[in-house]
Amino acid sequence: MAISALLLTGVLASDAIAQPAPRDQAPRTLPNIAPAGCMVVLGQPTVDYGHFTAGQLNRDTAHRYELERRSVPLTVNCPMARAIALRVSGPARHDGAVRFAGAGAVGIVLRNVRVDGDETRIQNPDSPQGPQAQLTLRPGDTVVLEHRRVGRNLTAQIDVNPEVTDADVRVNDQTVWSAVVQFELVNP
């Protein structure tokens, strides 16, 4: 099956040492595996939040700090029409959300789904809710097209919204946060 990975990174520095860290590691990427000629492509496979301090983050009333929401285009291309389903995988917290930093999470929303140029709704077959215009995704979720629709090309937007806790921002040195979220084309 075809797989594409989304890497989210950020470097938090204590206020005392807020200076850029050397980048000694290349971003991790996974190859797109495309049997039957299908490809899953992320328009921006790495979402890099750069270097920042806790004072630069927005804090909400629940003592969480939000990083800027970003949108990443997703494209699935197949040589022949087929049923399209995507499975999401990544590091999970105890509540099922994608883990980011120590106790933080990344909200993942799939929206604006189009198949062969036409808008379509999506659903999680394991959820009691019917087809929707957008879905919040967690590791292990599978997304299918409304009425098991078939097509050659799918385009969509993935919104990523990382947040971290008070404990995550209390650091004495630089701390690298990252999460890898994979989108795999599977048979529905």
Regions flagged by a language model, labelled:
Residues 17-188:
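Mature extracellular/passenger domains of Gram-negative fimbrial/pilin and adhesin proteins
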Residues 1-19:
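Gram-negative bacterial Sec-dependent N-terminal signal peptides
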